[in-house]
Amino acid sequence: MISRTYVINLARRPDKKDRILAEFLKLKEKGVELNCVIFEAVDGNNPEHLSRFNFKIPNWTDLNSGKPMTNGEVGCALSHWSVWKDVVDCVENGTLDKDCRILVLEDDVVFLDNFMERYQTYTSEITYNCDLLYLHRKPLNPYTETKISTHIVKPNKSYWACAYVITYQCAKKFMNANYLENLIPSDEFIPIMHGCNVYGFEKLFSNCEKIDCYAVQPSLVKLTSNAFNDSETFHSGSYVPSNKFNFDTDKQFRIVYIGPTKGNSFHRFTEYCKLYLLPYKVIDEKETNDFVSLRSELQSLSEQDLNTTLMLVVSVNHNDFCNTIPCAPTNEFIDKYKQLTTDTNSIVSAVQNGTNKTMFIGWANKISEFINHYHQKLTESNAETDINLANLLLISSISSDFNCVVEDVEGNLFQLINEESDIVFSTTTSRVNNKLGKTPSVLYANSDSSVIVLNKVENYTGYGWNEYYGYHVYPVKFDVLPKIYLSIRIVKNANVTKIAETLDYPKELITVSISRSEHDSFYQADIQKFLLSGADYYFYISGDCIITRPTILKELLELNKDFVGPLMRKGTESWTNYWGDIDPSNGYYKRSFDYFDIIGRDRVGCWNVPYLASVYLIKKSVIEQVPNLFTENSHMWNGSNIDMRLCHNLRKNNVFMYLSNLRPYGHIDDSINLEVLSGVPTEVTLYDLPTRKEEWEKKYLHPEFLSHLQNFKDFDYTEICNDVYSFPLFTPAFCKEVIEVMDKANLWSKGGDSYFDPRIGGVESYPTQDTQLYEVGLDKQWHYVVFNYVAPFVRHLYNNYKTKDINLAFVVKYDMERQSELAPHHDSSTYTLNIALNEYGKEYTAGGCEFIRHKFIWQGQKVGYATIHAGKLLAYHRALPITSGKRYILVSFVN
């Protein structure tokens, strides 16, 4: 049994505390009472909390991304350590027994159905020493793990430490490992302690006594649907150590940036420096050139700093934009510099290619000698050569007087992007490689087309999207909500104006402008009205876009972008309101490698894109910076439309455009014309699919299922036993109306021992009291449901399995008069859907389904939830008898 449950919770997150306590209350209502302790987490963003611990961080950076530990990861690691210490203290002072079992939970977990029953069943299979048992995790290579018994595996490397059970012996081993002397993320430390290799850091704990570790399969808990988006661990800044000792070096590293500070790319440059803990100094060279600026900076350093500072110099022409991304930690720059040089006198530079950017790295004292020597030579010769860093490196390459410069020809450190083929994207490492297989530490662009590629690099590095962690959302909360100028251009749909009424935003802060103008002059005139309105943001909605999410405005504001818009898609077509790339030969659409992943929401995030139209939110400062947003100029391609002009002008002024597909915000529908409609529209019914698809989905599909229809990766489904899953599919309205249709038709078959069924043309081995969907005219609608809603989920669930056809679809009624149960059987299907249509415990009692080979009974399925399992040979099952009432289920055999 579980002796005590620790729930790690930040004191400043009472919302998460209330949610997890509600989970324990649900268990209590089912007769399961856990001794729960809300354990105050260490807040990694609170220096006072961190000062309580004497800890050191080794030279830790994540091997995949190069990122250091975040404040949240430090706080999380110290929180778990504190729990382990409390367990040891409680055992040693007698408040816990030595043979105790301790459940450790983070506050974003959810107990799965029959948690305690399944926990007892699973743990009864453990007949060997087990120090730690994972109840939920993310295994990196699940297919290589050894299965010990039906529900227990021997884990390899796993991520997450959100739910596990430990013994006193385990806690003591953790305490004896000197974890605080080598603090790394807790979900890296635990695998090391059960024998996994983690980037070489296992050497730090090589002398520690290892634990016996196992994991349940399937999991007994899950994470909340927004666990990652609301994660303190992932979504906090990089931890900045208080001294250099923590990074095992007495040397310094510094970036000196000389160049313009205008445009979004400079802000991005500084954000990457902060992420990777790269110290930087900015020199805006408006008054002098880069040579003079750098010489002056070096002269200001002490001799000690000159001798101990490895300096990376990034110089950008003042007529250009920064467009440079550093994406590596300090130690990587130091290591690569050592690899590329033979001694400390050398300076490593990017390949000189006549760009507006100059980059090199070397020890500050040697750079100072190099510059002073060059300056002295020019002075002695009275040369009139233009003195700048680019010329300095050019001369060094052809003069024997300057032989200390080594060019980084393979792009180990510096990679100029000319076109997309220069780099290779990764969806798992938050880094990119070049075509030689090197992983550059600095990437930069110099042309319009290469800047578009560099902006894609932003999407997959830093805080961008990653296959393991998704996208890091840092919502900005406003103390005072900004004023909004809402501009709506009506084309066909007059009802689009209702968005102003449905927006979840204070109406007194919205100025609404509605226009029917079809002339391009409308746009430029409209932003002039905006500037006079006193509003802070310009929010534009085109008349062919239907907004379905009332919170869209608040959510776009929270992204804190200068220019941002939601994904708008036309049905299931590939037509959307954004372009992932632009053809440099004509200025029009070019498909990007990730276009379909983004519009299908297989990858969810906020994306830097080159073109965005139809719906967008613009900060006032952008319009003040680029007042002629919609004006055509000589640099544009012939035939550029108004949206192309807007995006061209934004790109030219280094204003990034961001596309959010974090939520389903709405869609494009240019075919509707509600102006001609009169009277009250009729209520949508079961039969109105697909003719009234949007309304049908909203009324009948479960909101959770509908919101994940384009991307099931984070969908909230449960594996109730091996390869049997439960998930929300329909609303109670759907279930209620299906029962009403069936009872009204009154076409129920005899069931029971009536084996001949003329509806299916022969003998039914396991007859039920049912009505086929085709008998009530719902077969075509069900076909649409299976192939457009269920089949995409099945592809996600069963390794891209493609649904072929529907064998049968029918509603079964179990009652006390005619048939209350069904004998054990296999279904004649590849997979079977079973949807609960009425409420367990209220409209019927007992019943349910027993999966005989799994030794598992599934009762109490929620209304509208579907169970999906394999048919034919694998899922041998039976319907258990009800004891009162009537039980309705919708069953479909699918191949």
From Swiss-Prot:
Its EC number is 1.14.11.4, 2.4.1.-. Residues 805-895 form the Fe2OG dioxygenase domain. It holds the Pfam family Glyco_transf_25. It comes from the Viruses. Residues 537-895 are annotated as: Glucosyl transferase region. Fe cation binds at residues 825, 827, 877. Keywords: Dioxygenase, Iron, Metal-binding, Oxidoreductase, Transferase, Vitamin C. Changing residue 250 to A: Partial loss of glucosyl transferase activity. InterPro entries: Collagen_mod_GT25 (IPR050757), Glyco_trans_25 (IPR002654), Nucleotide-diphossugar_trans (IPR029044), Oxoglu/Fe-dep_dioxygenase_dom (IPR005123), Pro_4_hyd_alph (IPR006620). PANTHER family: GLYCOSYLTRANSFERASE 25 FAMILY MEMBER, PROCOLLAGEN-LYSINE,2-OXOGLUTARATE 5-DIOXYGENASE/GLYCOSYLTRANSFERASE 25 FAMILY MEMBER. This is Procollagen lysyl hydroxylase and glycosyltransferase. The lineage of its organism: Viruses, Varidnaviria, Bamfordvirae, Nucleocytoviricota, Megaviricetes.
